[in-house]
Each structure stands twice: as C-alpha cells, then as structure tokens.
Amino acid sequence: MGNVHVYTWEPNSNAGKPLFALAEKGVAFEYHYINLTDFEQHAPEYLKINPAGTVPTLIHDGQVFTESTPMCEYISTAFPGISLVPEDPRARYRMRWWCRQVDINAAALSVLGWHTFLGPMVRQKPPEELERLIARIPTKERRLFWKTASQATFTEEQLANARARVGTWVARMDARLAESPYLVGPEYTLADLVAFANFYALPLTVPEHASEERVPHYIEWLRRIYRRPATLATYANARSLGRRAFQIARSIGVLPPEGPSS
C-alpha cells in the first residue's frame, strides 16, 4: 500500500474525513497532528506541504492530495478493503450528490462551531500573538474569517441564519433516512462518512433541531455509524474537540453512561 501520511487536526468536520476513511479501509498511516488552535496549518513548514494552509492533507507514496471529499474517494479506490463508493453509476451519482450537499451546508455549521467551540479556544491567546498568527494566513478570505471568529464578532443575525440552515438541512437528511438506513440506500457509503464527519455533533450543537423527537431517523442513523468499529477507533485518537463524540454516543445510548470520555 505504500507510505501513507495524514496531516490533519481532530476527527471533526473536514479534518476528520480521511481519518474515518482510512480506518474503514484498515489502512495503516502516520498521523501528523496539526493543531488549528495554535495555527499550525499556517506554519512555514506546513505551507511547504499544502500552500493553501488548510487541513487535511494526505500524502501517499510522495503524492500530495488535498480537498477532503475527493481525497476520501481516492482512499476508497486506491486501497483494498471495504468499498465506500458504489459500483452502480446511479448510486455513485447519488453518493456524490449527497457529498456535495454536505460540503455546501457544512459552511453554516462551521459558523456555529467557531462561535461555540473554536473561537473561545483561540481567544485564550494574547491579542498580540493572535494578530501575528492571523497575519500569516495565506488568503485574505481566510484571514477575515479567522479574525471574525477569534473576536466573537458573528452577529446574532448570522448565528440565527446558521442555526436555521442547519435545522433545514438535518430535517432534509431525516426525510431521506426515513426511506433507507443510509443516505444512498441500504449500504454505508462515502456520503454517510462525509455527512457524519460534519454533522455527528448536532445533538450537542443544535439540540433544538437535532432531538430524537424532531428527527428520529437522523438520530438512528447516528447510532448506526457510532457503532461502527472504525468510528469509535478514530475518536479514540482525539485530543480535544473530537472527544465530545463520546458524550454524544452516551447521550444516544451507544455507550453506557460511564464510557470513555477524555
């Protein structure tokens, strides 16, 4: 299989996608932890690997892969083991359609995640250090986003819109999951992996939209994926934000009340 290196952060959102994919495939790899709260993705040594300053980055036999969703499709097809990509052309189309929709709708969740979790973590740094770290971000767009997030300047309107978008999206997922156990059909695919990596924590992040009473099929889908051996094995390597997965798994009955938590 060759040498496999993954440069990424927690098993959370885009950063977690290749970790779940490699675990599902049973591929051994070297995990290079890039701490986003220390802005390590913008350090000169990392920018030599990925000039965009984003995570994740996969290196397989010297070839560099970026962009988390196509990266996971590469992982599925390049290595032996379980296939995450359907062979049937129509099912493959549906898989890619759902992956694209997840990537579009994850932007709203990113706003909430930054406001609730990452922003407070980053703001622990001295203002002068934070300003210096933001200044070295390669793109103007990302510099503005990090500045907004780190200064807690998302408006109430932005936050309300983000919550509404996430609520609409999870309701749409729930409607689909009322028809089949997974997003594409009866089998777990890359669409589920990508969606789970981004939306695994909704019962904690937006409980008003992601309760069992409101979206029971989504909650049952969460249970199915949390029970996959690759899922909890991946979260076992989390150091900070990803550890909340154990709290959620307990809250929905996947783990006993006193399971792993830190």
Language-model features, listed with the residues they occupy:
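Short secondary-structure boundary/hinge segments and terminal tails
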Residues: 39-40, 76, 195, 242-244
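Short, solvent-exposed turn/loop segments enriched in Gly/Ser/Thr/Pro and often Arg
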Residues: 9, 35, 190-192, 238-239
